[in-house]
């Protein structure tokens, strides 16, 4: 009897430490036209209010489609590495300061409208995202197919059936979506039969000034001339902006993304910065199978890890059709713009898409690099103190005042081009069992001194 009672109490104790929520409890049904953004926002707020520290929490979505619009979404000021720093951002599923949370889509499709970050996860520990896909009803990339290519009259093309467009008053082809209009400057050409990038094409110009319709949904662009684009070629027309990744992670510890697929994002599929220990298993930036009529996925890299540490594991994934690399792992240098004294430097983020977020902490190990030659200068050092220099808080800062434990090498100054590299925020990487195909640019980039 005593053993039975003990087991009963143990099981009850385990059950008491796990809370399960179903999104249908909040009035959101799968496959309805209801805007999911405000409902999910309220559900997350309720979970945060009710759950105690140490409890495991699961938020489940019954399988089906859920539509997220900008209206009712979470609005945030986020500074995201290697993305446009245009704030504020609108977020469909904003997860912040969470512990032991699992979002289980159970095979659901999360479909977004407008210009949004589908999912953000910040300052969280031991969280799992699994079993869902991310897509947009109207991608900001316009897929068109070449139907005629006349050396004198230019290229005639047909937009894909889902592409909404207009010919502007100044005769330019423009893509349309919920709350946005896009003019396209460049494109990537795909073989219409194989979906391979057309050999030796790289980024192609697609000038549409002077465009006109020759028939419904058939457009002639007299100034667009390129003999390589034979009839049947599919072009993903795009701009250079990258405002919103599919999933944004920052300052998280021990995160798993399991069987999550990103079919489109107006940025990178996954951007993780200043995170520790990330596992991707069955993660994909990919099409919806062999019969998907689309040829493209994300506007930039499939996955990107900036200033992370611990171990990054990416396995059993599919990366295809993206407009940049499958994976890029790196840190961000600060340029030395002022030597204050023998222990203090002012460093600045120089990349227009990488600033505004934390760079280092007291106790972090650093080294100094001469930018012209990439030579290491002086000895490794350690941060004793760091604070934003150009504003009162880290958020939105470009410059930092950094005091080091040991004296700085006399050669390091603001005149000769020196960078500061944070060695603490560098990860070990395991990238295995993944498929990369049919994408612009490269495959894998690993810039870390740790084991890869």
Regions found by a protein language model. Give the residues of each.
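Bacterial N-terminal signal peptides
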Residues: 1-10
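Extracellular/periplasmic carbohydrate-active domains that bind, remodel
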Residues: 16-452
């Amino acid at each position: 009897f005593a053993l039975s009672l003990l087991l009963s109490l143990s099981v009850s104790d385990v059950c008491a430490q796990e809370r399960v929520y179903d999104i249908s409890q909040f009035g959101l049904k799968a496959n309805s036209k209801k805007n999911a953004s405000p409902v999910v926002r309220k559900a997350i707020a309720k979970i945060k209010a009710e759950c105690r520290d140490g409890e495991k929490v699961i938020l489940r979505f019954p399988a089906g489609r859920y539509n997220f619009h900008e209206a009712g979404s979470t609005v945030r000021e986020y500074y995201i590495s290697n993305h446009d720093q245009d704030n504020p951002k609108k977020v469909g599923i904003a997860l912040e300061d969470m512990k032991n949370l699992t979002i289980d889509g159970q095979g659901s499709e999360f479909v977004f409208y407008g210009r949004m970050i589908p999912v953000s996860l910040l300052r969280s520990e031991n969280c799992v995202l699994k079993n869902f896909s991310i897509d947009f009803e109207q991608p900001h990339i316009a897929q068109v197919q070449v139907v005629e290519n006349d050396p004198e009259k230019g290229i005639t093309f047909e937009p894909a059936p889902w592409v909404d467009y207009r010919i502007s008053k100044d005769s330019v082809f423009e893509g349309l979506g919920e709350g946005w209009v896009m003019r396209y400057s460049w494109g990537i050409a795909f073989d219409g039969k194989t979906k391979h990038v057309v050999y030796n094409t790289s980024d192609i110009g697609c000038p549409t000034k002077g465009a006109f319709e020759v028939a419904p949904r058939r457009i002639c662009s007299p100034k667009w001339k390129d003999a390589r684009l034979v009839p049947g070629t599919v072009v993903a027309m795009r701009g250079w902006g990258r405002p919103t990744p599919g999933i944004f992670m920052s300052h998280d510890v021990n995160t798993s993304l399991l069987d999550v697929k990103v079919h489109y994002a107006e940025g990178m599929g996954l951007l993780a910065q200043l995170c520790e220990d990330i596992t991707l298993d069955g993660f994909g930036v990919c099409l919806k199978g062999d019969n998907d009529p689309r040829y493209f996925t994300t506007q930039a890299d499939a996955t990107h890890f900036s200033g992370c540490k611990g171990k990054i594991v990416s396995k059993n994934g599919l990366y295809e059709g993206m407009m940049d690399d499958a994976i890029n792992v790196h840190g961000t240098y600060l340029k030395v713009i002022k030597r204050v004294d023998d222990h203090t430097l002012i460093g600045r983020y120089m990349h227009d898409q990488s600033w505004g977020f934390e760079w280092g902490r007291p106790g972090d190990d650093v080294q100094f690099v001469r930018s012209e030659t990439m030579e290491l200068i002086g000895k490794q050092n350690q941060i004793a103190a760091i604070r934003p220099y150009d504003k009162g808080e880290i958020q939105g800062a470009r410059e930092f005042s950094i005091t080091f434990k040991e004296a700085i090498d006399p050669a390091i100054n603001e005149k000769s081009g020196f960078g500061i590299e944070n060695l603490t925020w560098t990860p070990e990487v395991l990238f295995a069992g993944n498929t990369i195909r049919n994408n612009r640019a490269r495959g894998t980039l690993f810039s870390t001194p740790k084991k890869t």
